[in-house]
């Protein structure tokens, strides 16, 4: 356990699968309380929280959230404020899949505005809205860390990845702007 992290709080979007779930467990193992979002499976999310609390003795809470409605981050963070006394880390991780990406994932000539817009909303807009809310709380405690997960698809060609790759490039640019403007706050 990292004693420098004990008692701090992580907020992460998309904490029930893959990298997001691994982050939930890794932070909790280091004594960090965890608030994470999930899209649809409440029971699965609650099972993760129970497991995390039992294994690591930290507080864990899961919140339903539709990443295609990033403007609702304000309400989400207001709920998190009721359950946790601080936010030290924010990871923008959740991504869309299935019907929401139709027209955004595929060959360049098959891309459609709706699919591209959905991916942009779930990556760039979600990062902006979530990071703004997290930063407001971090400023009150003297700083924190904000991360957005990305991929190499913005750097190298990956077949059928034009929609995702260009949006990952956009969110990485946005992260740089946020870092420059928020860096002075810690």
Pin down the residues of each PLM region:
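Conserved glycine-rich cofactor-binding loop
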Residues: 16-17
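Conserved glycine-rich Rossmann-like NAD(P)H-binding loop of the short-chain dehydrogenase/reductase
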Residues: 32-47
């Amino acid at each position: 356990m990292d004693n420098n992290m004990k008692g701090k709080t992580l907020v992460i979007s998309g904490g029930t699968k893959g990298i997001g779930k691994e982050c939930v467990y890794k932070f909790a193992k280091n004594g960090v309380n965890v608030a994470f979002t999930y899209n649809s499976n409440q029971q699965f999310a609650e099972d993760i929280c129970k497991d995390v609390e039992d294994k690591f003795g930290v507080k864990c809470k899961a919140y339903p959230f539709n990443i295609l409605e990033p403007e609702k981050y304000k309400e989400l963070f207001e709920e998190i404020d009721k359950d946790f006394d601080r936010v030290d880390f924010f990871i923008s991780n959740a991504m869309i899949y299935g019907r929401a990406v139709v027209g955004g994932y595929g060959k360049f000539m098959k891309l459609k505005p709706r699919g591209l817009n959905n991916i942009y909303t779930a990556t760039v807009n979600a990062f902006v809205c979530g990071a703004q809310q997290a930063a407001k709380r971090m400023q009150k405690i003297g700083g924190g860390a904000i991360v957005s997960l990305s991929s190499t698809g913005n750097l190298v060609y990956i077949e059928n990845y034009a929609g995702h790759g260009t949006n990952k490039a956009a969110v990485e640019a946005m992260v740089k702007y946020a870092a420059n403007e928020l860096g002075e706050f810690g």
